[in-house]
Amino acid sequence: MEVCNCIEPQWPADELLMKYQYISDFFIAVAYFSIPLELIYFVKKSAVFPYRWVLVQFGAFIVLCGATHLINLWTFTTHSRTVALVMTTAKVLTAVVSCATALMLVHIIPDLLSVKTRELFLKNKAAELDREMGLIRTQEETGRHVRMLTHEIRSTLDRHTILKTTLVELGRTLALEECALWMPTRTGLELQLSYTLRQQHPVEYTVPIQLPVINQVFGTSRAVKISPNSPVARLRPVSGKYLLGEVVAVRVPLLHLSNFQINDWPELSTKRYALMVLMLPSDSARQWHVHELELVEVVADQVAVALSHAAILEESMRARDLLMEQNVALDIARREAETAIRARNDFLAVMNHEMRTPMHAIIALSSLLQETELTPEQRLMVETVLKSSSLLATLMNDVLDLSRLEDGSLQLELGTFNLHTLFREVLNLIKPIAVVKKLPITLNLAPDLPEFVVGDEKRLMQIILNIVGNAVKFSKQGSISVTALVTKSDNRAPPDFFVVPTGSHFYLRVKVKDLGAGINPQDIPKLFTKFAQTQSLATRSSGGSGLGLAISKRFVNLMEGNIWIESEGVGKGCTAIFDVKLAISNESKQSGIPKVPANPQHVNFAGLKVLVMDENGVSRMVTKGLLVHLGCEVTTVSSNEECLRVVSHEHRVVFMDVCTPGVENYQIALRIHEKFTKRHQRPLLVALTGNTDKSTKEKCMSFGLDGVLLKPVSLDNMRNVLSDRLEHRVLYEAM
């Protein structure tokens, strides 16, 4: 019996339903297959999708679902076992993948639900970042304004310009209606309206500094909002205004300038502040923002620094101007002093010349009178005249020396000399006076004292003569000792003087001790003051001028030394000590100025022909008298031309007066040299001058004169000069 596997439709609508199922499964399969393709496409387009492996599972699930619907198309009709097997396999796989996907969704769905939370978080974070960016932009804008304002403020160091610039730039930057600066008064008890933005010349309006609103602002470094009706904020008209703009105030520190006194600057014994008031426009809803207040605070600090710099510069410029004025005054005073010194020197030079000419006559004639037969009374008068004249000549020399020491024109004349001989010569000059006063003098020379040294022999001798002479002058009894030694580093000396000997130099120490009148210790500093007279010394009664020690001190200073006096009091004697710097000489014999013969009185001048040229008739007569008394045959002339005409080889010596200014009298020496080409035929040329300055001696040497003789000249001086001429030696008397 044949079995039929065909399913016969039980009713006609079944076929229609089958067709609908067939079509539905087809479209379901198409949809299932298209969904993974769409997912794959969009996932590839997105680089941030985090669940790719989940998408693979979900895609497999959809594909398998679509496959079951597609396979199901073949099950609506009679189908083979293979189709049933495929259908079963597809459904099993679909079930497995569906379960796996369902299990995976348990973990995925919470993450998907948290996406909204993350979205809200990101939105909040973005809003916060926007706020921070706005703050950064605000700070950057504030910083830019601060830099701009600081540059404008620092572009000048004028105090008024700084303040006006600050107000203008703040008003422009912050769009202010008004801006003002209140400065403390000199007393610091009030604030005065000094600068405003809208008014070029504000009314001098003051408010007490103790107002509560001012104390509130001065109590903090921050900008403070104050009432628009505050006394310091009433700077704008209020008529027609419905709403006054907000007002802030900030303090401006006035830095303490301890080393300066600034005009119009308050006394800063306590910390003081200025007050800056800033006003927003009226009838507006604008308010102060935090960054604007910070800008105001920073600008206030910058203004404080700029004001301090300006104040310092202002005072420095004032000090500079004052210093320039003082320099001008000092320069004028210096020029006046130099003019006065030149006038004094010119006066002294003229007086020296004018006084030495009559002094020459007095001393020369007095010395001639001494050689004649005189009664004791006459001889005493002549000796008194001669002694007084010599004292006057010494005083003139001292005044000239002091003048040249003070203006710095006197320089040391260095040369090699015998130091031991110098001390013996000083004693030979002083002993006659000491013998009369019955004062024994002893000389102690240290064994290590160099014999030949380099220094200014004349000035050193002058110092020693002054000090030893004072010891003899002010001692009525006792003894005098003169000690010379080489100063050692450990020798006692004043605290401000240090001896530093070297291999080529040493310091000579001379100590002159006497048992005379002594000195009051309070009077010792006065001894080195020119023209000073101490009652303990009774200088005037002793015939002194008060110049000796003052000149000696200056000479010692020129020799890089020091001088001081020690005494225990009146009646106990005193000790004068000085150190001078000398150079050590390697010469075995002195090459300095030759000395006159020991006994010039024994030289015979009879028949010695001498020519005297002097424009002054009295001086010419006196010089002739001295020479005639010595036995010379004298010819006198009164002019250079006459001298040049008369001079001949028979004349052994020509005395020429060169006291007149100019070089005419020096030129005659050159013409005499030209006239006598052979030296042994030319007479020796000796200058007669009353000028003691070094330039006269140098000029005489440069014009070929053989010697210089200073007026006034005594008979002994003339005898010594002529004896030296006969020895054929060039003589330049120490000047």
Curated annotation (Swiss-Prot):
One of its GO terms (molecular function) is metal ion binding. One of its GO terms (biological process) is response to abscisic acid. It is an enzyme of class 2 (transferase). Keywords: ATP-binding, Copper, Disulfide bond, Endoplasmic reticulum, Ethylene signaling pathway, Isopeptide bond, Kinase, Membrane, Metal-binding, Nucleotide-binding, Phosphoprotein, Receptor, Transferase, Transmembrane, Transmembrane helix, Two-component regulatory system, Ubl conjugation. Gene3D superfamilies: 1.10.287.130, 3.30.450.40, 3.40.50.2300, Histidine kinase-like ATPase, C-terminal domain. It is found in: Endoplasmic reticulum membrane. Cu cation binds at C65, H69. There is a cross-link at K711 (Glycyl lysine isopeptide (Lys-Gly) (interchain with G-Cter in ubiquitin)). Coiled coil: none annotated. The modification 4-aspartylphosphate is found at D657. GO terms for cellular component: endoplasmic reticulum membrane. SUPFAM superfamilies: ATPase domain of HSP90 chaperone/DNA topoisomerase II/histidine kinase (SSF55874), CheY-like (SSF52172), GAF domain-like (SSF55781), Homodimeric domain of signal transducing histidine kinase (SSF47384). The modification Phosphohistidine is found at H353. May act early in the ethylene signal transduction pathway, possibly as an ethylene receptor, or as a regulator of the pathway. This is Ethylene receptor 1. It comes from Brassica oleracea (Wild cabbage).
